[in-house]
Amino acid sequence: MPTDNAIDVDLLVIGAGPTGLFATYYAGFRGFRVAVVDSLPELGGQITAMYPEKQILDVAGFPSVKGRDLVEGLVAQAATADPTYLLDRTATTLHEDDDAENGAVVVGLDDGTEVRAKAVLITAGIGKFSPRPLPAGDGWLGRGLEFFVPSFAPYAGKDVVIVGGGDSAFDWALHLEPVARSVTLVHRRDGFRAHQRTVEAVQASSVQIVTRAEVSAIRGNGVVESIEITVDGESTERPAQAIVAALGFVADLGPLQQWGLDVEKRHLVVDSSMRTNLARVFAAGDITEYPGKVRLIAVGFGEAATAVNNAAVVIDPSAHVFPGHSSEGS
C-alpha cells in the first residue's frame, strides 16, 4: 500500500537528462501531471555533470549549441508542464498498485517518498556513473587532478595533461587549447575512440598527442607540478599544473536491475513503442536497446515523444496515441 506521503501523478519520469526533460515537456503537452526523479542534485544529467561547456553538434536546429545552453532551453521548455522535480533522490523500488482505480505503479525513493503513477518512463541514460580512476592519481584528486571540466577558466595559463582517447578527452583538449599554456593528450594506444572529425581538429591544433603512453607518476608539493610519462618503457618528466583523467566511466543501473526489467548489457530492451516488458513501464534515450539503436541526444528526443504518446493510452484508455500536430491551429 502507498504511504500517506505518496505523490500522485499521471507519468513519472526517471532521469532528468535531455531525453527526460523533453519527455517532461511532451507529457505536459499531452495534458498529463508529471514528476521527475533524478539521483543528481541538478537537472541536465551527464551534460550538466560532465561537459556543460562542450559544443554539441548533433541536435536538430542548432549547428552548434553549448551543453549548458541546451539544458537551459530544455528546462525552460519543460517548465510549461509544471513538473514536480524530485532531485538528489534515487528510485529504489517499483511495484504495481492493485488498489488504484484503472491501475497504477508505485515507485519508492531512497528518502521514503513514494510516487504513484499511471505510467513510468525511464530515461536514466547509462545509469549511475563513476569515473574510472587514473592509476597514478591516488591522493591527487582536487589538487590538480580532475575527472570533469565544468569550466575552462581554472585552466588558463596552465600546462594541462589530458589522459584518454575518447570523445571527452579530445573535446576537452580542443576547448582547452586556446586557454591553457600547453595541452598534452596522453593515450595508451595508437587508435582513438573519439569522433574522427574531432580527432582531426586536435591533430591540426597545437595539442601534443603522445600515444602508447601512460602517466606513470604525479609529483608536486601539495598540488600537481609535474608528471612522468612512460612511452615504450622510457620515462620522461614534464611540467603540469592540471591533469584531466578522461578514462571513461563505470556505469551501474543500480536498483533498476532488481525490478524485473529485461536488461541486455546494462540497457533496457524495448519494442517499437518504447515499452519495456513490464506493464506501464516505458523507456527512452541511451538506456534503451533494440535492433538498430543509435545513442544520440537527437534520437532520444524522438524516443521520448514515442514513449509519451504510447503511454498516453495507458494513462487514459480513451486517449489516442497520435495527438495531432502541435503546429495545427485550433
Curated annotation (Swiss-Prot):
It holds the Pfam family Pyr_redox_2. InterPro entries: FAD/NAD-bd_sf, FAD/NAD-binding_dom, Fd--NADP_Rdtase_type_2, Ferredoxin-NADP_redctase_2. The keyword NADP applies. Keywords: FAD, Flavoprotein, NADP, Oxidoreductase. Its EC number is 1.18.1.2. GO terms for molecular function: ferredoxin-NADP+ reductase activity; flavin adenine dinucleotide binding; NADP binding. The keyword Oxidoreductase applies. It comes from the Bacteria. Binds 1 FAD per subunit. Signal peptide: none annotated. It catalyses: 2 reduced [2Fe-2S]-[ferredoxin] + NADP(+) + H(+) = 2 oxidized [2Fe-2S]-[ferredoxin] + NADPH. Its cofactor is FAD. FAD binds at T19, D38, Q46, Y51, A91, F129, D286, S327. Belongs to the ferredoxin--NADP reductase type 2 family. Homodimer. HAMAP family: FENR2. This is Ferredoxin--NADP reductase. The lineage of its organism: Bacteria, Bacillati, Actinomycetota, Actinomycetes, Propionibacteriales.
